[in-house]
Amino acid sequence: MAVPRNRHSNARKNIRRSHDAKKARHAAVCNNCKQAFIPHTVCTSCGFYNGKAVMTVEKK
């Protein structure tokens, strides 16, 4: 098996890992109910996607 010749420093390790953090999810506004939802998914509050009713949502 391959073995590293030299040890990587902590700084080099941390610089490599600086891009590994999870990114915050963006939110869009539904055109039908004006609630925030994740883009490219069905709106969870009204059930619309791309201006069309895709699923029925039970009202509380």
Swiss-Prot record:
Coiled coil: none
InterPro entries: Ribosomal_bL32 (IPR002677), Ribosomal_bL32_bact (IPR044957), Ribosomal_zn-bd (IPR011332)
Recorded GO CC terms: large ribosomal subunit
Record keywords, A-Z: Ribonucleoprotein, Ribosomal protein
Example GO biological process: translation
Gene Ontology MF terms: structural constituent of ribosome
Disulfide bonds: none
Region ranges (Disordered): 1-21
Similarity remark: Belongs to the bacterial ribosomal protein bL32 family.
Name this protein carries in UniProt: Large ribosomal subunit protein bL32
Gene name tied to this protein: rpmF
